A protein has these predicted regions:
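NAD(P)H-binding glycine-rich loop region in Rossmannoid oxidoreductase-like domains
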Residues: 53-91
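Local beta-strand N-terminus motif with an aromatic residue
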Residues: 2, 66-67, 109
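Rossmann-fold cofactor-recognition segment
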Residues: 43-56
């Protein structure tokens, strides 16, 4: 059975690299890259979906695409890149909690 993989944080270097590599994996049928801004680099044949993991809509994406694997790369290590510590915590903590909740509710993950 081939996998459908969702990769978060594809606009950042590491997330984009993971998405691009997964598109070359023969065991993976479909790769969906998610971020709030389009990636400035190639993500291979991965499909880009503009979405914020802090938004409950992420659950709909998991369900509609029948995602069975999630690779969470949407973490900000430097507060300056997020606009300060508060937005950094919101993205890292609230976003991760929302994504994990969506995974838990999903029938396919």
């Amino acid at each position: 059975m081939k996998r459908t993989v969702l990769v978060t944080g594809v606009s950042r270097h590491l997330g984009g690299l993971v998405a691009r590599r997964l598109t070359q994996d023969l065991a993976v049928e479909r790769v969906i890259g998610v971020d709030v801004i389009p990636p400035p680099h190639s993500i291979g044949s991965a499909e880009f979906v503009r979405a914020d993991i802090r938004n409950p809509m992420i659950g709909r994406i998991l369900e509609d695409a029948e995602v069975d694997t999630v690779v969470h790369m949407n973490v900000i290590a430097t507060p300056v890149l997020a606009g300060g510590r508060t937005p950094q915590k919101e993205i890292n903590v609230i976003g991760t909690m929302q994504l994990l909740g969506a995974c838990q509710k999903s029938a396919s993950v």
